[in-house]
UniProtKB/Swiss-Prot annotation:
Protein name: Protein kinase domain-containing protein ppk38
Annotated InterPro entries: Kinase-like_dom_sf, Prot_kinase_dom, Ser/Thr_kinase_AS
Species whose genome carries this gene: Schizosaccharomyces pombe (strain 972 / ATCC 24843)
GO cellular component: actin cortical patch; cytoplasm
Compositionally biased region (Polar residues): 369-415, 533-554
């Protein structure tokens, strides 16, 4: 192996580009290599079956892996994979490593030749495809689980430990029938501490996305902002997913996605049937938090107990369920309290575990015992304040989390059985009485608000039994003021019922309408004598009188113009509008001058007589306003927008 940190010292590659032809020979370290056939292709590699010749030994078959590194970072990753394979090469449950060579193809491109053990029986995924009709038995599953767990234990037992990070069915090979080996150590690394800054979290997410498969990712890989590190417990979770797929040929979170992984939401199918003990083993491995999962020794012991075979590895954990980066037992409480106040967490619910239910202890005494749980979550207390007793949480087709741990909680964290945890707080602050707020002005009734809205600027004077409003009346005409002052009060209430705003409004309207009839009645017109045509003066448009609205060729009497001129007061009260709305009506009528209004004539009256418009009642006026038939927005500009719709339709 010519591994070196200085890439410029690497020899230039003499290998042909593309696929290596059959019979091609080269030298890798002390082995003479001859290509026999092409096997497979990876993302940046080609795999060949070759024959090795070593001095003093008979030829044997091996695998040549030709890896292409497109930059220095990729070359460094290949270096790490080769070093990992050297560490685990002598173990019978891992694929053996024979040698490697590094070459330089250009300034920034490299290629590496790696010799590995050849497994003639293919991969585990190929073996599962041959058993689609007849599924694996429980003993076959336990044999595969035992070999893979032993291979992972070899990595976890190193100092410092290595984590595989990409445990899956595709990375298990069959060296011989009923003999399985773990391969593909390109994703292996040492334990990674939890991210403390946003930059560290972003880098950790990038590594997880690059070196792991999402179906086998643990919850702390999905959400790195929780602050949990990536250590041996991530491999424990991946083993649980792998065992589940051996049973049911699918991963537990295949269809639900990443959210199901975060919530540990999955179910056990009813077919094929397996023992409750095997399902409890899978459930123990698939725990939400790292400290809830067993270590690799506890997992291997349980599998050996189920297979009824001796345990041939020793316990380096001394009976403790610990890991490199994540706390266990009571240490988790202190760890969670620190993470709660850090800037990485998004919410309190992302720190503390979900309410969990208890699980029956497994047969192996080395696995976590639920009777010594480190603490009880809020969901473990019933409504009566008593803690729920440990019951079996397993049932077909369902899954709930359990809280396994071998660590005992310190006395200051223990919860008294039979009563929920109590907290001591200081005396509550005295309750300050709310100050009473008295309104500066009384609330107005609905009718009063309507009157105020329809008035111009000030509140309209309404005759009542109370004192008459004596505000500013300078804007009123003298005639209007006399009408209002001489208006009789509605004191004669024959019915004896209380007068309302509507009754007072009706009385006022009827009274003013009768006065308007007298004031608007035209003077007696003498018979026209010595009629002659008089042109209508053009400068007379400023006075909106009926005479100015007549045709210029119409014959009128000399004294008729003065008699037919209606004073502004009568115009303001033309429809019974009184009070301060008179000034508004005058302004509106002034804008109607340019467009003549249709006169109401009596067929029996003499020519030139003008019949005053019939006053409109409140009911008719309100109906017109509610049905919006009074005026509508015209399609023309100018003064035509004020055209009466009813007259236009005629």
């Amino acid at each position: 192996m010519n591994e070196t940190n200085n890439t410029s010292l690497l020899p230039v590659s003499s290998l042909p580009s593309g696929l290596l032809p059959v019979g091609f020979s080269c030298t890798v370290e002390k082995f003479s290599v001859t290509v026999k056939r092409y096997l497979a292709e990876g993302g940046f590699s080609h795999v060949y079956l070759v024959q090795l010749v070593f001095p003093g030994k008979p030829p044997f078959e091996a695998v040549l892996k030709r890896i292409f590194a497109t930059d220095a970072m990729a070359l460094r990753a290949v270096h790490e994979e080769v070093r990992t394979m050297k560490l685990v090469s002598n173990q019978k449950r891992c694929v053996s490593y024979y040698g490697s060579e590094f070459f330089r193809t250009s300034k920034n491109q490299f290629e590496v030749l790696v010799l590995l053990e050849y497994c003639p029986c293919g991969g585990l995924i190929d073996f599962l495809n041959t058993r689609l009709q007849v599924r694996l038995s429980e003993q076959e599953i336990l044999k595969i689980a035992s070999d893979v767990t032993e291979a992972v234990a070899v990595m976890h037992y190193l100092k410092p430990p290595l984590i595989h990070r990409d445990l899956k069915i595709e990375n298990v090979l069959l060296a011989a029938p009923n003999s399985y080996k773990l391969c593909d150590f390109g994703s292996a690394c040492h334990p990674i501490p939890g991210a403390k800054t946003a930059a560290e979290a972003k880098q950790l997410e990038y590594d997880i996305e690059k070196f792991t498969t999402w179906q086998y990712r643990c919850p702390e890989m999905i959400n790195v902002h929780k602050g949990f590190g990536i250590d041996e417990k991530s491999d424990i979770w991946a083993l649980g997913v792998l065992f589940y797929k051996l049973c049911y040929y699918t991963t537990p979170f295949e269809h639900q996605g990443l959210a199901a992984i975060m919530n540990v939401s999955y179910a056990f199918p009813t077919f094929p049937p397996y023992s409750d003990r095997l399902k409890r083993l899978i459930s123990t491995l698939l725990q939400q938090y790292p400290w809830q999962r067993p270590n690799i020794y506890q997992t291997f012991c349980e599998i050996c107990k189920m297979r009824n075979v001796p345990i041939h590895i020793y316990d380096i954990y001394n009976g403790k369920n610990v890991s490199s980066c994540n706390p266990s037992g009571s240490e988790y409480l202190q760890h969670a309290s620190k993470l709660e106040n850090s800037g990485i967490h998004q919410s309190k619910s992302s720190v503390f575990p979900q309410p969990a239910s208890a699980m029956k202890p497994m047969a192996s005494p080395m696995l976590p015992n639920v009777n010594s749980m480190p603490y009880l979550s809020n969901g473990d207390h019933n409504n009566n304040g008593n803690t729920s007793s440990p019951v079996s949480r397993f049932s077909y087709g369902q899954h709930t989390s359990n809280v396994p741990s071998t660590q005992k909680l310190p006395s200051n964290f223990r919860v008294t059985q039979g009563a929920p945890p109590s907290h001591t707080y200081g005396p509550p602050p005295p309750v300050q009485p709310k100050p009473k707020i008295s309104p500066t002005t009384p609330r107005l009734s609905t009718l009063a608000l309507a009157d105020d809205m329809f008035s111009s600027t000030a509140k309209e004077t309404v005759p009542t039994n109370e004192a008459v409003f004596t505000g500013d009346v300078k804007s009123f005409d003298s005639q209007e003021s006399n009408i209002i002052e001489s208006e009789p009060l509605s004191a004669s209430n024959a019915s004896g019922k209380p007068r309302t705003s509507v009754n007072r409004l009706v009385d006022r309207y009827n009274h003013t309408s009768s006065l308007n009839k007298v004031a608007a009645a035209p003077a007696p017109v003498p018979k026209p004598v010595n009629l002659k045509s008089v042109e209508n003066p053009q400068n007379n448009i400023s006075a909106p009188t009926p005479s100015s609205l007549q045709s210029s060729n119409a014959p009128v009497g000399l004294g008729e113009v003065e008699s037919k001129s209606v004073p502004p007061t009568n115009m303001a009260t033309e429809r019974g509008v009184v009070g301060r709305r008179a000034s508004m009506s005058i302004a509106v009528n002034a804008r109607r001058v340019s467009k003549p209004e249709k006169e109401h004539t009596n067929p029996n009256a003499e020519q030139g007589d003008v019949i005053p418009e019939k006053p409109m009642s409140i009911k008719e006026r309100m109906n017109m306003l509610m049905t919006k038939t009074d005026y509508e927005k015209p399609k023309v500009e100018g003064y035509g927008r004020y055209t009466d719709v009813q007259q236009t339709k005629k």
